[in-house]
Swiss-Prot record:
It comes from Saccharopolyspora erythraea (strain ATCC 11635 / DSM 40517 / JCM 4748 / NBRC 13426 / NCIMB 8594 / NRRL 2338). Mg(2+) 2 binds at residues 229-230. Anthranilate 1 binds at residues 85, 116. It catalyses: N-(5-phospho-beta-D-ribosyl)anthranilate + diphosphate = 5-phospho-alpha-D-ribose 1-diphosphate + anthranilate. Catalyzes the transfer of the phosphoribosyl group of 5-phosphorylribose-1-pyrophosphate (PRPP) to anthranilate to yield N-(5'-phosphoribosyl)-anthranilate (PRA). This is Anthranilate phosphoribosyltransferase. Its cofactor is Mg(2+). Anthranilate 2 binds at residue 171. Homodimer. Pfam families: Glycos_trans_3N, Glycos_transf_3. InterPro entries: Anthranilate_Pribosyl_Tfrase, Glycosyl_Trfase_fam3, Glycosyl_Trfase_fam3_N_dom, Glycosyl_Trfase_fam3_N_dom_sf, Nuc_phospho_transferase. 5-phospho-alpha-D-ribose 1-diphosphate binds at residues 85, 88-89, 93, 95-98, 113-121, 125. GO terms for molecular function: anthranilate phosphoribosyltransferase activity; magnesium ion binding.
Length: 351
């Protein structure tokens, strides 16, 4: 156990004095949040005091590990990649990570996507997949079958993390971003070894990268320099490259890959039906700013899966061509169609 674990008063006093906690301390606190033993006041005090001090990688890792220990397990037998952002970047953009997931799987790399309904936007991953006919709330065995059969599956956060309901009230009432906002990408129940992970919060992005490094994953942690929680096409993107337990920081520019700059308005989304239509047009081969953004993010996920190595730009350039081919061959459209049908069949069988 950590030095503070066992006493809320000691733990909160330590934080308020500006001192860091150990991973064991935050895991102890998170464990009580997940079991419902922590009162709403203690939940709120804990995450607000952490935010005021500034969360460390060890503190966030302790929370994420405790959350995973309470999740419903999902064993995927294949290496896979996750493509997900923290959300909350207020950009109101189309579902770029969702589209990139479909394209990456169509290019032959297994994807296990972790996500939820919209929090700050009009349309989250779950909302757009539901509008596309994908059964979003499959149990663990159903998600596993989807990945085995199709190379893609979606873990709906409320299905896999039911214990997080105890934090819902305090999260909503606090109304400011806290460590809870970055836990989603760190708690994919399939625990994929690779990821393209977006974080719009400039201070938290390198903290998240260090958590992934401590786990030994191969991850590109990205933040658009416009504040988007993905690789942006409106300007440059900062990339924290996580491989071999270390983190290095790079900057990439869409122009390096023959992609022109777009405006935020060109990536603007709407409700689930509007964004679903954008997905359909993307997989049908429509050119333009949305495709450009999807290609870069899909290439980033492939690079993370393959291991970015020492030449990130060279890797991304080759992968942009590979993911473009997955759209233009019709493979992405075919996969989306099969995913909707197969997930619905599996859902019926598991009812």
């Amino acid at each position: 156990m950590g030095t503070m674990a066992g006493s809320w008063a000691a733990l909160l006093g330590h934080l308020v004095a500006g001192n860091d906690l150990s991973a064991e301390d935050t895991a102890w606190a998170m464990d009580l949040v997940m079991t419902g033993e922590a009162t709403p006041a203690r939940v709120a005090a804990f995450v607000v005091a952490l935010r005021a001090k500034g969360e460390t990688p060890a503190e966030v890792r302790g929370m994420a590990d405790a959350m995973l220990s309470h999740s419903r397990p999902l064993e995927i037998r294949r290496r896979a990649v996750d493509i997900v952002g923290t959300g909350g970047d207020r950009s109101g953009s189309v579902n770029i990570s969702t589209m990139a997931s479909i394209v990456v799987a169509a290019a032959g790399v297994p994807v296990v996507k972790h996500g939820n309904r919209a929090a700050s936007s009009k349309c989250g991953t779950a909302d757009v997949l539901e509008a596309l006919g994908v059964a979003i709330d499959l149990p663990p065995e159903g998600v596993r079958r989807c990945v085995e059969d199709l190379g893609i599956g979606f873990c709906f956060a409320p299905v896999f993390h039911p214990a997080m309901r105890h934090a819902a009230g305090p999260r909503r009432e606090i109304g400011i971003p806290t460590a809870f906002n970055v836990l989603g990408p760190l708690t994919n129940p399939a625990r994929p070894s690779a990821g393209l992970i977006g974080c719009g919060d400039q201070r938290m992005a390198p903290v998240m990268a260090e958590v992934f490094a401590a786990r030994g994953g191969s991850v590109l942690l990205v933040r658009g320099d416009d504040g988007m929680d993905e690789i942006t096409t409106t300007t440059t993107t900062t990339v924290w490259v996580v491989q071999g337990g270390t983190v290095t920081e790079e900057s990439i520019d869409p122009a390096e890959f023959g992609i022109g700059y777009s405006t935020p308005a060109e990536l603007q989304g709407g409700d689930a039906e509007v964004n679903a239509e954008v997905v359909r047009r993307l997989v049908a081969g429509e050119a333009g700013p949305v495709r450009d953004a999807v290609l870069l993010n899909a290439a980033g996920a492939l690079a993370a899966f393959e291991g970015p190595g020492t030449d990130l730009r060279g890797r991304l350039g080759a992968d942009v061509e590979r993911v473009a081919a997955a759209i233009d061959s019709g493979a992405a459209a075919d996969l989306l169609d099969r995913w909707a049908k197969r997930s619905t069949e599996i859902m019926r069988e598991s009812e």
